[in-house]
Amino acid sequence: MSSSIFEMTIDHDGMDSTGLKLSQTASSISMGDEFLCSSTTSNSILDSPLPKVTFNHIDSITDINTNIMNEIVEPQSGVDVDVADKNVLYCIDPYPVEPPCYDFANPSKVIRYPIYEHCRPCLTSVKPPSYTPSVEHYTVVSMKMEKLSPFENASSRLWNNFILQINSTQINFYSIDDSLTRHIKNYRGGDMFDHSHHSKTASDRHHSARSLLNAFTTKSTYQFDKYDKERICGEIARDEHKFLSDERLFKSYSLQCAKVGLPIDYSSRDFVLRMRCEGQQFLVQFSHVDELIYWAMYLNMGISLSLDLELREMPTYRSVPRRRHPRARRFKQHNKNKNKNKSRQNSDRNDSRSHSLLLRRSHTSSVVTKVATGNERPTNKSRSRSLSLLPPSVSDASHDSNGPNDSGSLAGESSQTDFCGLFTSKLRNFFKTDSSSRKNSNMDIGQKMRSKELNSVQEEIDDNGSTTNTNTSVLSSTFSPTAHSVLTAQTSIHENFRSRSNSNPIDPLRCDRSVLKINNFEPVYEGTGRSTISNSAERTNREEKLNRGNEDVNGDEDDDEDEDDANYEEDDEDGYVEDDDINRLVYLDERESRYENADVEYGTIFSTKSFSVTGCLNHDFPKKLSLKCGNKNQSSNDSKWAPATQLVSRKRYIKDSLRCIKPLTEDHPWVGKIIFKPALPPAFETNNPPIRVYSGEDSTDLMHVKNHYLKPYIVGSCGFLKTGSKLFHFYDRTNDLTNL
């Protein structure tokens, strides 16, 4: 549409201007003419002519009559406004509007939108997919009730065995069927675990009093181990409807506003978690440390999913393990350095004492051997396994190989015998550990042998395998190089233990590196005249170098652990887990893994033809050294641009996992927290009715009912308070709740 510029001119030179003149760039028209507007798309906007206006002589534009201006502005009554609006819209978009094509609406072929043009309506017979829980697992546990409510302690604090199941947002405890425990001799699942109790719900107090009385007269509850758990869970997986039926339900808890954590104040049993559900507090014991870590994760997932979306908070998981307190850490590091300095001073003092003691022992043993007959065998029960396997002719052959018996040869041989006897006791003390707190009094002999210390495994081999190994082809009636290498290796190992016994106690988790590398001994053959111990000075220097290398390796390992701990974020908001508790669980896991492989390892070692003490000791600890010393021989460029993957040891994995679990003590505050209590269902019918197991409609114990209804309360100082929906956002903040 063409636009024109209008300007109003007035002639003051004596000319009578009888009208306003409109000047245009290309042409000019007068006000009296008809105002027409041409366009390429429409004929005209205003078809009616404008009114003609005559002016007298005016001095300024302000003298114009306002009525005349209103007449110019206001349109005539005959003009249709709707028609004019339609014409304007038609000028803007004359063509009909249609939806664009998908190619123009989405030019990018990467983004794809679903097209439902050819969809058919769903039939009424088609059902939606079945429900699948977010978290679903089960295992065998032992449970101990601590509190029936925040204001009432449990009358019966006995352990009872159950099948624990987590079904998304609730946990269920089922009684264990007798067919699952028939392989366990004298099994006892606890006094509360009684099938007759399911039919008599009115005698709860009498039952708890009777259970407290029977605690002093009956046997302890059986504690499941890893093998029992795997076998029982395998049988449950074959028939879940039978073993996880509603008739076997003992209790059902909702995970809404529940809490779970490590009971750092409880040390009677291992692998235990403390839980708070529906106002009750109880302990749950698992079979091993891996199961404890997994179930802590499962329970936290269920707690995060339990509340509604509008009431749910962002979960605060501990994905980074917390370090211990800096004050306690500095104190521990100071004592560690202090003990290192003392051990170094004591080692220098004891070197001379050990040397003189060895000389006195050798002289005394030489006098004793002169009195004893040559064919008499020692009957001491504490002699080494290797010497007991040798026939009597071995000792005679050792005398004859060096000519006539003199005091020096007798002293050397008696010192070897004494060394080997002491080596056996040292080796047994090396693997000896504290008595386990998880002993079962009603276990059979095979299970007791497997669950005791490693020394019991060795004694069992002594009793059963001594007669069979003496007839093997390894130990002949004559003196053999293999037997002599055994004696030589035992003598060297004993000297190393003897020199370090007073200064540095042996740690069962860290083997001495000098013990691991005893592969350079040369066997002495008959008639060669070589000494049984080759050049003691060179061997002493080699052992000192290996000992220094072992100290460096252990120091590097401690430094690596300290550096890892220094990178941990310190957070004391919810407390921290004591290192003693974590180290205790780690130690139990390492001991249990050692028991699992004890029968296989020692059974195969002592039955092979190339038996040696070196192979026996090298079997348990090569992986630890290879992880620490593997990257030192690589070039700098390879380690910089293609670094080797750092394998996390199992000990570090367990420590980090346990530090990520928040602690929960028995006296953790209840006041100000929101809990859910079981409530009666509404009067109207719902689509999710509660599942009653064995109780009648008049039962008051709603925890024996699946899908029972809940009602929120605030724990006060003297009782429960009613709560509203606003408080759910602050259910974990005590100060905000108490100030409302």
Swiss-Prot record:
The residue ranges flagged as biased composition, category Basic and acidic residues, are: 345-354, 539-551
> Acidic residues compositional bias: what residue ranges?
553-576
Polar residues: compositionally biased ranges: 400-414, 529-538
Please note every region of biased composition (Basic residues). Answer: 320-343
Against InterPro entries, the record matches this protein to: PH-like_dom_sf
Gene Ontology CC entries for this record: mitochondrion
Query: For the region Disordered, what residue ranges are annotated?
Result: 318-414, 525-576
Per the record, the similarity remark reads: To yeast YHR131c.
In its UniProt entry, what is this protein called? Answer: Uncharacterized protein YNL144C
